[in-house]
Amino acid sequence: MGYNRALRYSKHEGTTCVIDNQHYKSLGAVLKDVKHKKDRLREAEIEPVLDIADQYMVTEDPFRGPGKNVRITLFKECRRVEPDTLKLVCNWSGKEFLREMWTRFISEEFPITTDQQIMNMWFEIQVRPMQPNRCYKFTMQYALDAHPDYVPHDVIRAQDPYYIGPNNIERINLKKGFAFPLMCLQSVYNDNFETFFEDVLWPYFHRPLVYIGTTSSETEEILLEVSFLFKIKEFAPDVPLYTGPAY
């Protein structure tokens, strides 16, 4: 094969050609071969570790699992927190369960047309400082298995709290460990709103007692946003809503 100017710079990666009885290979193909060789060496080193790791099972984050996540914001409030103390976020006295708010949420997220099951529930709290340029961290303590008749204190002394996660958002898994049996939640909610939470929600999910504090040595004003996050499993309706040639 004679000399050809078109073969000086190959348009195809990894192609070879023969010019004056000499074999030529594109530089990109050579660099790719070096990269692939490094990848094969790295895979050979980690392969024994992966063989051992395949024998173990680890739990995944249930928040990122299958299902639809829906949120209801219970309240937003500004609180004053004293140093070296933790303040109760909510005592479940009733302001978290306003009928107008929950009725709108249930009717929008749990329609009658589909069967929906609550797979899991989280208590989410988001905290932000009210004053700018404040350098402190947020601390937190919570309890799940408190007795129903226990009256929590509004303020407790900070003893071995932990820091709230990234972006000042913390989620607490409230699932007790067994499945939530109800399928048509809106009809149950409409039938007995007064006893819905005590008879339907809390038997299957924990009612947390959450305390929030700061690492500041001064009294700080913080903004709390408290929400419930539901993971919902949806099922198709049993029968079509309409009958006719178009359906």
From Swiss-Prot:
What the protein does comes down to:
Component of the virus occlusion bodies, which are large proteinaceous structures, that protect the virus from the outside environment for extended periods until they are ingested by insect larvae.
Query: How is this protein named in the record?
Result: Granulin
One of the record's GO cellular component terms: viral occlusion body
Which InterPro entries does the entry mention? Polyhedrin
- Is Ubl conjugation among this UniProt entry's keywords? no
GO MF annotations, alphabetized: structural molecule activity
Where does this protein come from, organism-wise?
Answer: Pieris brassicae granulosis virus
S-S pairs: none
Q: What is the lineage of its organism?
A: Viruses, Viruses incertae sedis, Naldaviricetes, Lefavirales, Baculoviridae
From what superkingdom does this record's organism come?
Viruses
A Pfam family assignment: Polyhedrin
Ordered alphabetically, the record's keywords are: Viral occlusion body
Record-stated family:
Belongs to the polyhedrin family.
Give yes or no: UniProt keyword Phosphoprotein.
no
